[in-house]
Amino acid sequence: SAVAMHIKGTPKDMQKDPQYDDLMAEIISYFENVAWKANVAGIKQIIIDPGIGFGKTVEHNLQIIKNLSDLKRLDTPIMIGISRKSMIGKILNTDDVNDRHEGTITLNTISVLNGAHIIRVHDVIEGVRTAKIIDAYRKA
């Protein structure tokens, strides 16, 4: 298995006015191409990460989270990395990463409910507790 992450541009220029004609369609097309290349290379399963914060505006990131279920058609696990991201700081108007816990938990919860299978976190205990609550909710 391998994790493949979407990025628009390169780390040097990715945040310089990122533009998309159709955000989700471009991300899906990217992963279809990656899956084909991975298969040719003998990698049978990839985990996809839409790359929150990598060549995307806050609005793009929120659109991805809102439409995460669109990626289910790729029939592969979806990983999301939102933990402490600057987008949370921008939404909450704070530069302090210690003020991003609630935003991380909220967006992780929404992401899992919208189709994410894996959440990448800095705060493992809070992440596990969030997952347990989501599991209990789904089983109710």
Tell where the protein language model's regions lie, with residue ranges.
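Active-site-adjacent loop and "lid" segments of alpha/beta metabolic enzymes
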Residues: S1-V40, G55-A140
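Active-site metal-binding loops of divalent metal-dependent hydrolases
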Residues: I52
